[in-house]
C-alpha cells in the first residue's frame, strides 16, 4: 500500500477502460494506492491500479510517497472466504520483491507480475 501526499499540482493517472485517466486532484490530501499484495489478499476485490505520473515541466510538483510492505518472510495468499475459491497461489513477499527488483535490470531477470501466480479457474 502507498500513502501519497501531493501538493497543489495534479499529475497522477490510472489506466482504466483502455485509457489513461487523471485522478481527481484535491490539494493537500492523501491518496491511498493499493498494491499487488492487497489485490492478492483480497482475491481481486481491491485491484492494484496501473498508474503513472505525468509531469508538467512548467510547474513545480511535490509529492511524498510512503510505502507500506509486509515483512520479507510473509507468505501472501487470498484471505479465507468460504464463498469463493482462491484466485492466487501463495506468494512469499521477499521472493516476489527480489524478483521484481531483478526484473528492473534486463540482464538479471524477468519482470514478474502477480498474474504469474494466478490460479486458473475451470
Residue ranges of predicted features:
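C-terminal flanking tails of non-heme Fe-dependent oxygenases
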Residues: 1-122
Amino acid at each position: 500500500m502507498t500513502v501519497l501526499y501531493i501538493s497543489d499540482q495534479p499529475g497522477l493517472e490510472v489506466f482504466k477502460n483502455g485509457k489513461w485517466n487523471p485522478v481527481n486532484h484535491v490539494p493537500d490530501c492523501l491518496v491511498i494506492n493499493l498494491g499487488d499484495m492487497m489485490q492478492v489478499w483480497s482475491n481481486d476485490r481491491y485491484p492494484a491500479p496501473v498508474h503513472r505520473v505525468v509531469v508538467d515541466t512548467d510547474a513545480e510538483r511535490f509529492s511524498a510517497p510512503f510505502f507500506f510492505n509486509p515483512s520479507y518472510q510473509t507468505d501472501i495468499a487470498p484471505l479465507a472466504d468460504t464463498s469463493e475459491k482462491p484466485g492466487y497461489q501463495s506468494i512469499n513477499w521477499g521472493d516476489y520483491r527480489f524478483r521484481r527488483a531483478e526484473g528492473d535490470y534486463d540482464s538479471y531477470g524477468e519482470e514478474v507480475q502477480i498474474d504469474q501466480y494466478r490460479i486458473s479457474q475451470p
